[in-house]
Amino acid sequence: MTNRRVACLAGLLAVVASVTFPETVAGQATETALVAEATGHGSWLGPDGQPLPFASDEELLEFLRTAEVVESEDIPVGITKPLKLVLEKDGVRARAAFRYEEVERKDVSIEGRHYRRFRDSCRFECAAYRLARLLGLDRVPPTTDRKFQGRSGSVQIWVEGSLDEEAKDFRAPNPLAYVRQTWDQDFFDNLILNVDRNSTNIIVDKSYKLWLIDHTRAFQPVPELLDAKRVTRINRTMWTRLKEMDEDALREAVSPYLDGEEIMCLARRRELLLERVEALVAERGEGVFY
C-alpha cells in the first residue's frame, strides 16, 4: 500500500469517526442508501463507455468465454504480464484482461512469512470470483476460464473509466461507504491469503466502488490468516454467509481451481476468521457489524 493511499484512507477514517448516524429507522435507511449508492455498479461498460447488454453475470461470463478476440495487447503493469483483449460477439464489444501464468516455486519468503510451496496461478482469479459471489461480495469483476492463442487462462471483464485513488483531488463523496469497502477487502484478503494486494490491483470506478483484481498470488497453502488485526469491522452479510457455508459448498466453489492442500488451508482460514469475528463480538458487541 502506497503512502498516498494510506494518507487517503486515514483521512476518510477521520471523517467517518466524526460522523454519527441516528439510531432511528430513518437514520438507518439514510446510511443504507449511502452505502448502496457507493457500492452498486449498475451496468458493465464497453470501450465506448456505453452499458453492455448483459442482464446477469452468467450472460457476461458466457460472452467472456465465447466471444471472438479481435484485438490484444500487453498490459505493462503487474508481475504476471497479462493481456488486454477486445472481445466481440453479435455486435457487442467489451474489453477484458487475460492472464495465463502458471508458476510454482519452492521455499519463498514474503513479508516475513515462509511458503514451502508458492504458486502464482491465473486459475486463482476464477477461484476468487466464485468465492466472492458465494460470500455476497460484489467486488471481484466477473471472471472465467478461457483459451487464447493455445494458452489456458482466466479472462476478466475490464473495469472501464476507473478513477485514480492516489490523485491529489480524489475525494470519495461518502467516506463511510468508501471505508466500508476497504473493510470488506481486508476480510476477503485474510480469507484467501492474498499476499499481493497493492494500489495496482484495486480499481475505483466512477461510482466510487472498489474492484479487487489480480489474485494470482492468493490461496497459498498456509493455514494462517494474512493479518487478523486488520479485521476490525465486519460486513454482516459476508459474515453470515461465511458462517453458514459448509465445507462441501466451499469445495464445490473452488475445487476446479485449487488443489487439495490449498482447499484444506482455505477451510482452516475460514475457521480462524470465524474465531476472530466471534472474539471481536465478545469484546465489543454487535457494533462490530455493519
Residue spans for each PLM region:
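Regulatory N- and C-terminal appendages and interdomain linkers associated
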Residues: 9-95, 260-290
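Extracytoplasmic/periplasmic, Sec-exported soluble proteins
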Residues: 52, 120-124, 194, 258, ...
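ATP-dependent phospho-/nucleotidyl transfer catalytic cores
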Residues: 148-191, 231-233, 240-264, 271-272
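Bacterial N-terminal signal peptides that target proteins for export
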Residues: 1-10
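Conserved ATP-binding subdomain of kinase catalytic cores across diverse folds
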Residues: 65-173, 189-194, 206
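C-terminal catalytic region of ATP-dependent kinase domains
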Residues: 88, 117, 204-290
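Active-site acidic catalytic loop and adjacent metal/ATP-binding pocket
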Residues: 85, 98, 181-218, 266
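A short secondary-structure junction signal
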Residues: 166-170, 197-202, 223-224
